[in-house]
Swiss-Prot record:
It holds the Pfam family Ery_res_leader1. This is 23S rRNA methylase leader peptide. Involved in erythromycin resistance. Keywords: Antibiotic resistance, Leader peptide, Plasmid. It comes from the Bacteria.
Length: 21
């Protein structure tokens, strides 16, 4: 899904706000 891919990239960029496991 494009949404998931975009969100994933944004999450990686904002690791401070949303630290992924």
């Amino acid at each position: 899904m494009l949404i998931s891919g975009t969100a994933f990239l944004r999450l990686r960029t904002n690791r401070k706000a949303f630290p992924t496991p």
